[in-house]
Amino acid sequence: MDQTAAFHISVLASGSSGNSLYIESEKKKILVDAGLSGKKITSLLQEIGKTPEELDAIFVTHEHRDHIHGVGVLARKYKLDIYANEKTWQAMDPLIGIVPTEQKCHFEMGKVLTF
């Protein structure tokens, strides 16, 4: 791993009402979880000087509602890829609405996922 790589993290929300992190590196801008409405996530991004249009993807840690509430809306509206493991996809898929297959990205637990 490159020891000189830098990234910035902003906690947008944390708690039972919703969770979301914004992570930015030199190459990518990722939303980790979107547990609030798409509108609220957009507002929180704007508070840190960012917009959903700048995002490259959404990474979902698990399928609980306080982590996925805005995932489907944001992915559809901004054509964002969604990354989740197979079990999370199975549980989350019927809850987030229709997302184009090409935006559904799977990863294996324990494997390194490089952005």
Task: Cite the ranges covered by each PLM segment.
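Metallo-beta-lactamase
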Residues: 86-115
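Short glycine-enriched loop/turn motifs at secondary-structure junctions
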Residues: 26, 75-76, 97
